[in-house]
Amino acid sequence: MTRHAEKRVVITGIGVRAPGGAGTAAFWDLLTAGRTATRTISLFDAAPYRSRIAGEIDFDPIGEGLSPRQASTYDRATQLAVVCAREALKDSGLDPAAVNPERIGVSIGTAVGCTTGLDREYARVSEGGSRWLVDHTLAVEQLFDYFVPTSICREVAWEAGAEGPVTVVSTGCTSGLDAVGYGTELIRDGRADVVVCGATDAPISPITVACFDAIKATSANNDDPAHASRPFDRNRDGFVLGEGSAVFVLEELSAARRRGAHAYAEVRGFATRSNAFHMTGLKPDGREMAEAITAALDQARRTGDDLHYINAHGSGTRQNDRHETAAFKRSLGQRAYDVPVSSIKSMIGHSLGAIGSLELAACALAIEHGVIPPTANYEEPDPECDLDYVPNVAREQRVDTVLSVGSGFGGFQSAAVLARPKETRS
């Protein structure tokens, strides 16, 4: 892993769409205020479902600058990704036309792809699922795009003029972390000079809500949606579904400095592991997540003593929060009790594949502004979750090095380390 030390990769552009407001500034304002943006589902009639709450985005495709064609034919997840890619490129100050297009890469994560569009079209052509599709002429042209998640990274690649490596990463709820990890590797390995990377998911649709209902993973606290997402709280009863996108522009630090670009954070380390255990179950000792944390810190040439903040997966399920707490203790030892830990899912919900990138955006902004977002709705401690979860109120302090972790159904465990880019030690 030390082979990468000579190439330092930094984030020079950020684009965010999340519940609670459009843009990076609105996202950060919501997090630091400790406000929640979860509410009763309005995107469809969720009355028949067990969980009827979500973190929705007030999103107007035309108002966001998409063309009528993009607004009418792109899946919502694709729309979010394209808008965020545009915002990230603008924020970076980079003109893609000034870069060899073969040296621009794209890495976009998604857990459920274009499920919303697919769900909608299936209902339309099958009379709500009451009959099989017998007349293919009823299907819209973009049905194939809804069927394959590669359509998302294709549109982002076209937006960036990217002719280099382009990929979609789909590793469940770690997709957003993994996509950025892969994008970082493209630059470190010399396969790209610029990578537009991140993740998107718009899973608030009947089929996705039904899937999580079936395994009782989501909160049923429908009478109080603003307080339903309660990571690490003793009374948590599952996660609250969300939607969103975060996209970054990555460059080598020296190239960013040559053009006078602002660097939010350096991607120092990344690692991923699998528990090879169960579709939804987690081993209680947190070993695989702990191994990912240790490997990411090793690649970053950091230790637990260097950490100022941990952005937890913190989904709000009974087993995840216990498992994650155990992983922090296993990997960091006594230091785990001293490092502030928080979960932004308490405020914006769990946007599946997109959440890892949204959390990395929060980490980069924590470094930028010297503020740690809180864990909202934290009221009653769980004896098995006994760390400092930054309850309810943001905390101002210098933040130089941050760990962000993710856990996904299927056993995926990922970790990334971001650091203040002006640091010179390798």
Curated annotation (Swiss-Prot):
- Native species of this protein? Streptomyces glaucescens
Tell me which family the UniProt entry assigns to this protein: Belongs to the thiolase-like superfamily. Beta-ketoacyl-ACP synthases family.
Q: Which residues form the Ketosynthase family 3 (KS3) domain?
A: 6-420
According to its UniProt record, the EC number is: 2.3.1.235
Task: Provide the effect of residue 351 to A.
Answer: Produces high amounts of tetracenomycin F2
Gene Ontology MF terms: 3-oxoacyl-[acyl-carrier-protein] synthase activity
Tell me the Pfam families matching this sequence. ketoacyl-synt, Ketoacyl-synt_C
What gene does this protein come from?
tcmK
Catalyzed chemical reaction(s): 10 malonyl-CoA + 8 H(+) = tetracenomycin F2 + 10 CO2 + 10 CoA + 2 H2O
Q: Which GO terms describe its cellular component?
A: cytosol
Q: Does the keyword Plastid apply?
A: no
Q: Which InterPro entries match?
A: Beta-ketoacyl_synthase (IPR000794), Ketoacyl_synth_AS (IPR018201), Ketoacyl_synth_C (IPR014031), Ketoacyl_synth_N (IPR014030), PKS_Beta-ketoAc_synthase_dom (IPR020841), Thiolase-like (IPR016039)
What is its quaternary makeup?
The tetracenomycin polyketide synthase (TCM PKS) is composed of a ketosynthase complex (TcmKL), an acyl carrier protein (TcmM), a cyclase (TcmN) and a probable second cyclase (TcmJ). TcmK and TcmL form a heterodimeric complex.
Copy the pathway line from the protein's UniProt record: Antibiotic biosynthesis; tetracenomycin C biosynthesis
Q: What does this protein do?
A: Involved in the biosynthesis of tetracenomycin C (TCM C). Part of a type II polyketide synthase (PKS) that catalyzes the synthesis of tetracenomycin F2 (TCM F2), a precursor of TCM C, from malonyl-CoA. TcmK and TcmL form a heterodimeric alpha-beta complex that catalyzes the condensation reactions between the growing acyl-enzyme chain and the malonyl-CoA extender units.
Under which name does UniProt file this protein? Tetracenomycin polyketide synthase ketoacyl synthase alpha subunit
Q: What keywords are assigned to this protein?
A: Acyltransferase, Antibiotic biosynthesis, Transferase
Q: Which residues form a coiled coil?
A: none
